[in-house]
Amino acid sequence: MEKNEEFFDIRELISIMLQAFSYIDEYAKKVKEEKVENKMFIKEENEKFTELDYLTQTLLVNTIHKFYGNLNIKIIGEETLNEEYNKIIIDPNNEDKKEFLSSIDKISKDINFNFPPEFNLDSKRLKKINNSEISFFFDPIDGTKSLLKKKYYPVTTLLGVRIDNMPFIGFIHFVFDKENKTFFNFPTLGIYEYNPLLKIFDKKEIKSDENKFNFAISSTRATKEMIDFIKTFPNSEYENESGLGTKMIKCLLEDKIYFTTGKNSVGLWDICAASCLLNEIGLDIYCFNGEKAKFIPKKIYFDSNGVICLTFYKFKIKCFI
């Protein structure tokens, strides 16, 4: 290894994020049990977010800066962190919030997880990053619409990491799930699930039938025509709930077809996190014009006036806009 070479240790990143997710889960549990208040706010274009969204993003941003601030990094999250919201939401006199945000001090880059043996190969876990731009894209709480209705299962934290212009590693973490599972890809080795209760990493067998369609659809409006179209598919389920991460995992692991509506737009964080996992099993996301989805650092990647559709078919995925 040359003296000036810089490497990105994937196991280290996974360790850091799994620790961060565990603290998010602890605070989210208090929200669910109504031990802490979770106020709602409305930002531009009538988009709603809660204190849990904002606090989670603050923790993730600070964690990334703590461990990777010395690298050429770019961070893009769904929520906008600013002084106005800091004064309202991050109350230094609130012990629960103070404890949650101070949990960053407990997060370590030490690799304390019992990774599978295949994760230990230097050629697999180290990525050369000399002069590379490392971008972190995340939706701190994907499924706010469901959360506000106290429907917790669709709620996830999405994190996608891009090195230069290529999606590299993605995380889909189930915040309110009773087992708080995390799904992620380990580049070149497949898709894994981490169960913090059992403390094990499980490589997932992806269900794929080239003659079958699986859909995860988001739309700005659930029209009668669209719902009628959905009903024409056998073994389909329609859910008027948010949570792209949940639908992604269901489509990959279950022998069902899932539909969801109600999302106003798809952020870069959604596309990047999903692409990292899908690329791992030989799938790509394509735009309607047939081009592969690009990862351009904009606030919103796609504005959907119609239907966004991830189509699993013959090992291709198309994103219809």
Stretches found by the model and what they are:
Residues 1-141:
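N-terminal subdomain of lithium-sensitive/metallo-dependent phosphomonoesterases centered on the IMPase/IPPase/PAP
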Residues 74, 169, 257-259:
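Short, Asp-centered acidic motifs that coordinate Mg2+ and/or phosphate
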Residues 124-192:
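DPxDG-like acidic metal-binding loop motif
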Residues 145, 165, 196-198, 290-292, ...:
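Detector for glycine-centered tight turns/loop "hinges" at secondary-structure junctions
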Residues 167, 201-205:
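Tryptophan-centered short beta-strand motifs
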Residues 190-193, 198-200, 314-318:
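Short helix-loop capping/hinge motifs at secondary-structure junctions, enriched
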Residues 204-321:
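An extended, acidic
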